UniProtKB/Swiss-Prot annotation:
Originating gene: prfC
Record organism: Levilactobacillus brevis (strain ATCC 367 / BCRC 12310 / CIP 105137 / JCM 1170 / LMG 11437 / NCIMB 947 / NCTC 947) (Lactobacillus brevis)
A cellular component annotation (GO) from this entry: cytosol
Family, per entry: Belongs to the TRAFAC class translation factor GTPase superfamily. Classic translation factor GTPase family. PrfC subfamily.
Pfam families: EF-G_D2 (PF22042), GTP_EFTU (PF00009), RF3_C (PF16658)
Domain tr-type G: 11-279
UniProt name for this protein: Peptide chain release factor 3
Key word Cell wall biogenesis/degradation present: no
Lineage: Bacteria, Bacillati, Bacillota, Bacilli, Lactobacillales
Chain positions recorded as GTP binding sites: 20-27, 88-92, 142-145
Domain of life: Bacteria
Gene Ontology biological-process entries: regulation of translational termination
Amino acid sequence: MSEKTLATAVDKRRTFAIISHPDAGKTTITEQLLLFGGVVREAGTVKARKSGNFAKSDWMEIEQKRGISVTSSVMQFDYQGKRINILDTPGHEDFSEDTYRTLMAVDSAVMVIDSAKGIEPQTKKLFQICKMRGIPIFTFMNKLDRDGREPLDLIAELEDVLGIEGYPMNWPIGMGKELKGLYDRYHQRVALFRPEDDAHQYLPLNADGDLATANELEEDGLYQEARDNMLLIEEAGNQFDAAKIASGDQTPVFFGSALANFGVKTFLETYLEYAPQPASHQTPDGATVAPTDPEFSGFVFKIQANMNPNHRDRIAFVRICSGEFERGMDVIQERTGKKMRLSNVTEFMADTRENVETAVAGDIIGLYDTGNFQIGDAIYTGKTKIKFEKLPQFTPELFVRVAAKNVMKQKSFHKGINQLVQEGAVQLYTSYSTGDYILGAVGQLQFEVFQFRMQNEYNSEVIMEPMGKKTARWINPDQLDERMSSSRNLLVKDSQGAPLFLFENRFAERWFQDKYPDVELTAKL
């Protein structure tokens, strides 16, 4: 591919994550976007679990049973000349590490907010990661077909709680049962909620912001209120600033209802106007890898086992950072220095997949993995070694001892635990004294998902003995004396063989540090 052709292909890519608090409607809006992309004929309804009509992005059995997302899904489609890569992330806080890693693989984020609840805790946490990365954030105020908070309050909350300017691209004309439409000053039109037909979906506005043709809506107090609010904001509110959007200092705000498929298309088309093309990536030494660099490079941000339970496969998800991927190409794995051929590569629609012949910077590809990859691995071509910034890893707070219920099924137990731990959702530790397996997680739901998947995907029932909260601290192996371990600080090693103590509490940690003042303890963050 020539330099010019590569630049043109990269320019068409738009890669974003959808972030929200659980139940704000993140998966539903994903479904509607796929509908516009022609990928699905009808959007699944997350609520309708009994019907078997599950969300396309919630492909794992436990997600379909619970109606929640616990994994990051990758979906790709073309729309209006752009190749769109959507990463639908878990909203549940117990799976925030998976979400944080996903946010390292995108160029922008869509923040979905329940208009009845406003900004919720998980939304705030995920926003801070996006802010830290300086990526553009686009906001969709969802569930307008239900009664919610005042739009002015929601806009003000963005600035008060998140510290980001909000610029409303449209304004609701009523809400809940009284929802009439959206006053869309940006596109100079009113979008009607449930019009007679598609031909009468929009009413044009004139230069003064009034309806261009006579309509009974003009006499409606809700319309007049929306019009007045929008014009007031134009005079006294934040001014639209594309540069601030690009730097993540201003967020365009769209109102709508994902469930009613109202306002979503307008959002998508406007998003494509302002969303950035693939960005450059930094290396630990401060160098920049540009997306149009001719040499291929990328990094593994996620590993997922058993996307196809019949084949017990593993997929390593790679964000391409530069150049072009071609099927059958040889790459170097930075961590090991090994050369490997990328022959079996796929692209995704949640659990369905297609073989991919070529892909460019900004795309997400899946490599069939036999155990060669770890999260954070870089792969590249060319003579210059490429390494990317380290992906975030959380220090677990909850721990359980885990063992196979049936000692005759040790083989499937070990295979399952190794594969699921490599996904990064739980951490594995081994007791120095007994050899017991110990799992660490950020939240209880991770253990429940682990137990469910071990039984359903590996036919291995497990016994889990809660150990409660612990404080994990790593120790330099050169300073380690196994006699330092006691009933209050269990000595274990992590999956890489590094020693650490699991302290009962902070008091036990302080007692240890008083007893061994020269020993350095560290928390992996």
